[in-house]
């Protein structure tokens, strides 16, 4: 079954870059959660573990592809964007969402942007810094197509935790420079209703570090990004965002980026990402 949602863009959905990446992910992620809830037949906020603890469908992997024919900044105020989501479930605890979005009349076009989401149910064990995998006791997702273990994005995130790379940048991309930016989490702006640092805001953190690393010049437009999430952070913590800038002779009008986000509390890596952006 395909879950379909329409969003008409207004001021709350846009910024100076129009349908910017972190805003797009907020709404696409919300539709992913709504789809999981529809499959469960229950609001996700009502799900509990066997011992009564709250559970949350946390994102652990995102792969976003934005074709040049439909850049995010081409979606403007009052445009309607349709999201179509197909889910697969892994052992009642993890989910893959294959998402396509575009203007309704173009959604079936092969040039539509796409996202691959992966979620897993977790519960905070000792605040945001200690999250435990926690299957809900009262939900059954057997009606969803199964996600084979070998296709579970978990394997991608585990490999990236060892190599530091996510496969967006190959050996043709040569590192040009690096930069580190610190960011104090803003409890009012950066958290969600579950009390966690919101997954989409990690992109805003990375964009902030990227702007510091690259001198002001041509605008950059996302073409491909992968994100692996490994944890969260206390709402009063500070993050260190490392960004490395890459160039490729084969892609002179593009820049590559590799990001690492660490929390100050214990120095743990909570996110890795790689992206390729076109220079406008």
Kindly give the residue locations of the regions a language model identified.
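Acidic/His-leaning functional-site neighborhoods
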Residues: 169-179, 184-242, 246-258, 269
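HotDog/MaoC-like acyl-thioester-processing domains
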Residues: 70-160, 233-235, 246-280
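Generic preference for flexible, low-structure residues
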Residues: 40, 44, 97-103, 131-133, ...
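A generic structural micro-environment signature
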Residues: 15-17, 24-25, 30, 61, ...
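Sequence-level detector for tyrosine residue identity
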Residues: 3-5, 56, 60-61, 141, ...
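Non-catalytic linker/capping segments at the edges of enzyme domains
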Residues: 1-30, 93, 112-113, 118-194, ...
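Hydrophobic, proline/glycine-rich low-complexity stretches
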Residues: 1-84, 90, 206-210, 214-219, ...
């Amino acid at each position: 079954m395909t879950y379909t949602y329409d969003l008409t863009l207004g001021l709350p959905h846009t910024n100076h870059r129009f349908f910017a990446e972190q805003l797009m992910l907020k709404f696409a992620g919300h539709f992913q959660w709504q789809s999981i809830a529809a499959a469960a037949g229950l609001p996700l906020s009502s799900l509990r573990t066997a011992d009564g603890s709250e559970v949350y469908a946390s994102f652990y992997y995102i792969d976003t592809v934005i074709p040049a024919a439909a850049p995010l900044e081409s979606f403007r105020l009052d445009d309607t964007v349709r999201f179509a989501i197909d889910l697969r479930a892994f052992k009642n605890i993890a989910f893959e969402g294959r998402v396509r979005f575009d203007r309704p009349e173009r959604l079936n076009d092969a040039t539509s942007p796409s996202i691959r989401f992966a979620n897993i149910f977790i519960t905070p064990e000792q605040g945001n810094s200690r999250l435990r995998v926690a299957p809900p006791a009262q939900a059954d997702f057997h009606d969803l197509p199964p996600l084979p273990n070998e296709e579970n994005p978990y394997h991608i995130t585990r490999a990236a935790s060892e190599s530091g790379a996510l496969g967006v940048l190959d050996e043709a991309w040569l590192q040009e420079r690096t930069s580190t930016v610190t960011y104090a989490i803003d409890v009012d702006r950066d958290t969600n209703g579950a009390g966690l640092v919101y997954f989409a805001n990690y992109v805003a953190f990375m964009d902030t570090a990227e702007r510091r690393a690259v001198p002001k010049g041509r605008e950059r437009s996302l073409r491909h990004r992968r994100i692996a999430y490994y944890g969260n952070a206390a709402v009063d913590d500070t993050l260190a965002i490392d960004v490395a800038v890459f160039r490729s002779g084969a892609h002179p009008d593009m820049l590559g980026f590799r990001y690492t986000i660490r929390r100050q509390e214990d120095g743990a890596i909570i996110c890795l990402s790689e992206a390729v952006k076109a220079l406008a």
